[in-house]
Amino acid sequence: MQQTTKLFLGALKYSIPHLGKCMPKQNYCNVADPYYNRLRLKNYRLTKCLQNKPKISELARNIPSRSFSVKDKLEKPESLQKRGINICMDAFEKVRTRLETQPQEEYEIVNAEIKHGGFVYYQEGCCLVRSKDEEADSDNYEVLFNLEELKLEQPFIDCIRVAPDEKYVAAKIRAEDSETSTCIVVKLSDQPAMEASFPNVSSFEWVKDEEDEDVLFYTFQRNLRCHDVYRATFGDNKRNERFYTEKDPSYFVFLYLTKDSRFLTLNIMNKTTSEVWLIDGLSPWDPPMLIQKRIHGMLYYVEHRDDELYILTNVGEPTEFKLMRTAADAPAIMNWDLFFTMKRNTKVVDLDMFKDHCVLFLKHSNLLYVNVIGLADDSVRSLKLPPWACGFIMDTNSDPKNCPFQLCSPIRPPKYYTYKFAEGKLFEETGHEDPITKTSRVLRIEAKSKDGKLVPMTVFHKTDSEDLQRKPLLVHVYGAYGMDLKMNFRPERRVLVDDGWILAYCHVRGGGELGLQWHADGRLTKKLNGLADLEACIKTLHSQGFSQPSLTTLSAFSAGGVLVGALCNSKPELLRAVTLEAPFLDVLNTMMDTTLPLTLEELEEWGNPSSDEKHKNYIKRYCPCQNMKPQHYPSVHITAYENDERVPLKGIVNYTEKLKEAVAEHSKGAGEGYQPPNIVLDIQPGGNHVIEDSHKKITTQMKFLYDELGLDSTDAFEALKKYLKV
């Protein structure tokens, strides 16, 4: 239902079972847009300094211490699938070649990649390879393993880890249409060979013991649940043994190696609570050390530097994240000293630790910041990032002098930045200036929700657009699990803006844009806050001259389907069309079915309708499947996946049947000439959740939106071609 780099917090967020692809400690990781966010510029130079004197932080203070129409009967998935493919094949063929080739003109697609010693390890074609660091951009590389040996459909490397002394390399590999991963271990020699393989691996890390033997720790995933940790050795002393089993089914486990490799952290987590154990990176056979026993509602994550633990936690008031510090040999909570705290409504996006600095990536008032803390003198420098930026893409870096990262937006590809500690300045890449900077605008506006709460929105439109009220509008929403609405670069979003569309991203309660409390105010028995926020956002957009209901469309994936489905029931007059992908729509029946793999882990977000009548009645108030009635609905296009374990197909089909019945009932009394909405269910093969974006899927969804608004889709594809020539 839910939908992460190194980095620290980004890696740990991946452990939430609803996340997709993750490459902790790899560059260019993003789970919602994995194709387009494996992009990097082929050539760039960091020469332009953005400022001379970073200002003291205003955010923080340093403290000492998924076809069928309504006229059709339900068909078999195979026929639906074929129909869905045929709908837009002609349109797709017009732009496929350019879609597939253009990104390589200025960008290259980057899969998992990691630097270790003097080598770079990465995927080239269908192989795991390595090359010398200085030859990384050439064709001079050594093949370590052919992924085709695993006989997977379109396999790719999800994550790479190299043993400390480079005797072994481990890589997690999976198929594009599956969430099941296999971890292979390759012995590095003159003739590299696969030493072992482990199925169903989620996270994994290397450490070295006192005998200089490489030890691989990994978590085993069963039915989407990670409860077991194993450790394995290779060579003459080969073994594989279970190290830890979590017995509480509502928790999951995840491994994270501190940046200095001193400790391997065993993180035991659910949506609201965590517990961390430290495994000595020098003595991995010793018993692990508990940092703090789990306390309901208390979250914490651990990094290490110079015999000190840096703990990001929500303990204490306000119940937002703050940074604490304690000696590594005295990790208990009573020894934690408050080191740094964020201003209210600030989202901690990530944290990176360097030799002399700690870098916090923050979001405040819907804008991005970087705070650099000097660990020697506790100084704080706050950098307000360019207002066009909507998302960070973290880079790993072993250079203690520089902190590199990328910034992006839904309509602007990633751009490199580097903060240089010695100079105390932020530098951006120079060279080709993206024309979108002059042809589009990004606005931050707010909507007042029913209870008076101000809800932030991010809006994009063409600079030279006239009469915005007559322009089509595409609204995006998520609002669950404390996760931010994904705002990474997507070429089709840019095409829409170039073609005159308005894009609006609504950061409603239940998401994480304004911190932990923003999530708390939109979960359990406060889910209706998110619905009220979404309604207020769309009404505010219309009242401020951004489009009108007959030109308004709404899009969401996964858990975002709850709010979209609920709004279609309560305020269908606000919308003309909706696109949903792998949507969660049958909340009540799903949460009452404890045989589903993730129900128990979802209780903290949706409640327990099986044992709590209050939760059951509350869910009934907003659950999309429970509140449909004969009325005029917007047209709906749903993309679903046959073997999706996170959002079962059964619930989506049930929703679609009920929606079709409600539309048919309304049509009986609507009078002659009434045009019912189109209800399309496109069932795709595969078992992944929110599968990799294919060009075919993109064009199908775009064509649906254009057709429903009565717009000529040919213009859109011509606009796409024009953009691709830029």
Swiss-Prot record:
It is an enzyme of class 3 (hydrolase). It holds the Pfam family Peptidase_S9. One of its GO terms (biological process) is Golgi to plasma membrane protein transport. GO terms for molecular function: peptidase activity; serine-type endopeptidase activity. It comes from the Eukaryota. GO terms for cellular component: cytoskeleton; cytosol; Golgi apparatus; nucleus; trans-Golgi network. Belongs to the peptidase S9A family. Homodimer. Interacts with the AP-1 complex. Serine peptidase whose precise substrate specificity remains unclear. Does not cleave peptides after a arginine or lysine residue. Regulates trans-Golgi network morphology and sorting by regulating the membrane binding of the AP-1 complex. May play a role in the regulation of synaptic vesicle exocytosis. PANTHER family: PROLYL ENDOPEPTIDASE-LIKE, PROTEASE FAMILY S9A OLIGOPEPTIDASE. This is Prolyl endopeptidase-like. It comes from Rattus norvegicus (Rat). The lineage of its organism: Eukaryota, Metazoa, Chordata, Craniata, Vertebrata. The gene is Prepl.
